[in-house]
UniProtKB/Swiss-Prot annotation:
UniProt modified residues of type N-acetylthreonine: T2
EC number(s) from the headed UniProt entry: 1.10.3.9
Binding residue positions for chlorophyll a PD2: H198
Gene that encodes it: psbD
UniProt cross-references to Gene3D superfamilies, sorted A to Z: Photosystem II protein D1-like
Modified residues (Phosphothreonine): T2
GO BP annotations, alphabetical order: photosynthetic electron transport in photosystem II
Keywords: Acetylation, Chlorophyll, Chloroplast, Chromophore, Electron transport, Iron, Magnesium, Membrane, Metal-binding, Oxidoreductase, Phosphoprotein, Photosynthesis, Photosystem II, Plastid, Thylakoid, Transmembrane, Transmembrane helix, Transport
Record-annotated membrane-spanning stretches: 41-61, 125-141, 153-166, 208-228, 279-295
The protein's name: Photosystem II D2 protein
Reactions performed catalytically: 2 a plastoquinone + 4 hnu + 2 H2O = 2 a plastoquinol + O2
Binding positions for a plastoquinone per the UniProt entry: H215, F262
Amino acid sequence: MTIALGKSSKEEQTLFDIMDDWLRRDRFVFVGWSGLLLFPCAYFALGGWFTGTTFVTSWYTHGLASSYLEGCNFLTAAVSTPANSLAHSLLLLWGPEAQGDFTRWCQLGGLWAFVALHGAFGLIGFMLRQFELARSVQLRPYNAIAFSAPIAVFVSVFLIYPLGQSGWFFAPSFGVAAIFRFILFFQGFHNWTLNPFHMMGVAGVLGAALLCAIHGATVENTLFEDGDGANTFRAFNPTQAEETYSMVTANRFWSQIFGVAFSNKRWLHFFMLFVPVTGLWMSAIGVVGLALNLRAYDFVSQEIRAAEDPEFETFYTKNILLNEGIRAWMAAQDQPHENLIFPEEVLPRGNAL
């Protein structure tokens, strides 16, 4: 009798197949390959931020108190940037600055670099998570594309801007009041509000808020019928075949209001995606420009006339004077390592004074 030897119908799984099966299986919280980047980085970024705001001072880097331990509250606590003298050092715990000393590492601002880098990779991991899940259930990847906008803003503000300046010192510290200080710094030193990329960013964010409000109200106004369930989740069957609201009625309403209206849901929802994402991307591009110290609009003719004529002043020239005031008053406070001292007679005053 002849016995034919052949391969088993079930081939032996490789290590990659085993990992892929475990990572991508259906569970309450999806892990996925993106989770290998997302979960550790998000854990370390949040853990570093909570540790820094609770225990770590900014005395050695900014001359400030910045932790709950020192008396700050949620609005004033922060994980502060390293000192300007450390330039763009990665501030690794085992690096030449801290030499493995955790306390010294925290004093030097190592937690800021730790939180910033892990935060950036955590956000990228979250975007990849959306892309991976979309691929798994055969959706288009527009969620991931949309999330690229806040990633672009984070990377441009926290990483690219300080890379263009003299050090991480000029990045925002991770805290509420610290972000407010950074905004004032951006205005005083870069005239950020007059930057066209900032204008596009504001238009995108506020325009998106307006679109969301209009869209939500319109859908509520044109529901075919209210459900009789106790709440929204029980009122309607998620697998219903019919539409929930009348697009035709909504189109007629806004056609009468504005004279124009979206004719189909695809264009409507793409526009709601396009406005905020484009706005945030433009804002990120503008911050990259600031990293290179590119200037905003300059209306020099108005500045010259205001300097020659004490009675001539515009909102622009007043803002320029305010920016000078921010720089003069803020630099000495914000950069104590420079030992800046401005006599009162050189501090800016308006034409009226």
